[in-house]
Regions:
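Walker B beta-strand of ABC/ABC-like P-loop ATPase nucleotide-binding domains
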Residues: 1-4
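Canonical AAA+ ATPase core
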Residues: 7-8, 12-15, 20-97, 102-112, ...
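Alpha-helical structural signal
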Residues: 13, 37, 60-61, 77, ...
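Short acidic/histidine-centered micro-motifs embedded in hydrophobic/aromatic stretches
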Residues: 19, 83, 125, 170-174, ...
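Alpha-helix N-cap and coil->helix boundary residues
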Residues: 55, 76, 113, 117, ...
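Conserved AAA+ ATPase small/helical "lid" subdomain
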Residues: 92-147
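C-terminal engagement/docking regions of AAA+ P-loop ATPases
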Residues: 131-218
Length: 218
């Protein structure tokens, strides 16, 4: 867990590249494989800029998704107050899954069927990020792989054994937004990114049919 990761120096941030990609760390010439399951979760404060450093593109590309939390709703705010009213709820945490169950779940996504049409849909979306006039840095091949993985996981959570175009569309923003560099940023970057991504999605034809793992049209 990297809290406010953009406060780390570029040298410290670069040290994460090996463990994020290769699941290993090298110290003084000695390489150690990291135990599984392993993942990197980081937070970033977009408001404060003093004492912060921009995250390099190579590091951003290794984060599967980026989610903006925003402020809690009224209901969520009340629930937070209730939980912290008497004691810190973090003091009473129970595991919800074993290590083996997590590893098995991580392996299951690769079994989710993806039709040729959906694969082409993913690639066309990614290619559009490289051709859009407002984008100076488009999505890399690693980003297209991340979009595929996220769509497969989305299908699992929705109770299906195949990926639909909607799974892909719903994952475009969290998977691709942080991988894109806009040419001219005037005002709020987030708003401009949303507009650009919407333009890309509207410009790529959606496959007319989803095909399940047994070959049935749906």
């Amino acid at each position: 867990l990297g809290d406010e990761i953009n406060r780390a120096t570029p040298r410290t941030q670069s040290s994460l590249l090996e463990c994020m990609e290769e699941r290993q760390v090298t110290v003084d010439g000695n390489t150690r494989t990291l135990d599984q399951p392993f993942m990197v979760v980081a937070t970033q404060n977009p408001v404060e800029t003093q004492g912060t450093f921009p995250l390099p593109e190579a590091q951003l590309d290794r984060f599967l998704i980026k989610i903006e939390m925003g402020y809690p709703t009224t209901t969520e705010g009340i629930e937070i107050l209730k939980r912290f009213k008497q004691q810190n709820p973090l003091l009473d945490i129970e595991p919800v899954a074993t290590k083996e169950e997590i590893i098995e779940a991580q392996q299951n996504y690769s079994k989710i069927f993806v039709s040729e049409d959906v694969l082409q849909y993913i690639i066309k979306i990614v290619e559009m990020t490289r051709q859009h006039n407002d984008i100076v840095l488009g999505v890399s091949p690693r980003g297209s792989q991340a979009l595929l993985k996220a769509a497969q996981v989305c299908a699992i959570l929705r109770g299906r054994d195949y990926v639909s175009p909607d799974d892909v569309k719903d994952m475009v923003k969290p998977v691709l937004a942080h991988r894109i560099m806009l040419r001219n940023v005037m005002g709020k970057r987030e708003g401009q990114l949303n507009i650009v991504l919407e333009q890309i999605l509207k410009g790529v034809p959606v496959p007319s049919e989803a095909i399940s793992s047994n070959g049935d049209n749906l």
